[in-house]
Amino acid sequence: MANHKSAEKRARQTIKRTERNRFYRTRLKNITKAVREAAANNDKEAAANALKIANKSIHAMVSRGFLKKQTASRRVSRLALLVNKIA
């Protein structure tokens, strides 16, 4: 347990940050999974809608500091390639 006020505050901040990161990590996995599943089912319309949501969500994570800009661009790009491969 923390013995100093500043250490107690840092411990509280760590808990908050961990919960926030867990939320974004889970959300990122779920939106990516939705796009991949729609692409696997060859459902072009559903995949395009899921990609649109994923694009918006991923870039929102960049503005909140959860992802770096290059990482977000790479993820969106790979998902877009997957959706564009659907005949």
Swiss-Prot record:
Pfam families xrefs: Ribosomal_S20p
Record-stated family: Belongs to the bacterial ribosomal protein bS20 family.
Role this protein plays: Binds directly to 16S ribosomal RNA.
tRNA-binding is among the record's keywords: no
Disordered: annotated span: 1-20
GO cellular component: cytosol; small ribosomal subunit
UniProt GO BP: translation
Keywords for the protein's UniProt record, in alphabetical order: Ribonucleoprotein, Ribosomal protein, RNA-binding, rRNA-binding
Glycosyltransferase recorded as keyword: no
Gene3D superfamilies linked to this entry: Ribosomal protein S20
Name of the featured protein: Small ribosomal subunit protein bS20
Gene: rpsT
Transmembrane regions: none
InterPro entries, per database record: Ribosomal_bS20, Ribosomal_bS20_sf
Protein species of origin: Campylobacter lari (strain RM2100 / D67 / ATCC BAA-1060)
GO molecular function, one term: structural constituent of ribosome
